[in-house]
């Protein structure tokens, strides 16, 4: 029943809301969108991963992208060699040149996501793009993923278990500024068992794709962290600013 507001129906309701009451806007791609501002969906992940059945979600590719982030990699050719081409369009020679990144080798996306998770605040160099080729200690910066894990271990009820992929000082060095850019974890305790929840915030969400994809992405990350720190996964909360559907996807 739609009245139960299962996660799947929350997702479909959000799509309907965008189509029915969204504002038509132009965008950087020239495609145009229907958009609303401010949305939220909550997913129970205590027993399963929320793979929405109304949209194909490539589970294996999402895992590879997550591991790529966790390593701090920013070379899309690492994924491409595995047949994963999700970043190829945003790292072509033409795309990089249009961003003013003529000095980047094709395939390099600059200081975003994984680099910011593992080396926030460090100066970026294209030699850092493939972390398997050198000792990453030379990069420096602040390791946010380690910070999160340290807090989960020694101060799990902290309200500061946060990572960010948004560094305004480096936006011009990025092939594409991060869309999902704020992640907060929360630990609760029930009957002596700790439960881990995650809220991720997207400044811009292509809701036909991003909601499904990134919900699974952060569910997997939460499962990994919960397992490492003797916790149970509880909830994923998706929050989006500009929540839109591209006009080409309306049908």
Whereabouts are the PLM-identified features?
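Terminal, non-catalytic protein-protein interaction segments that mediate quaternary/complex assembly
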Residues: 1-250
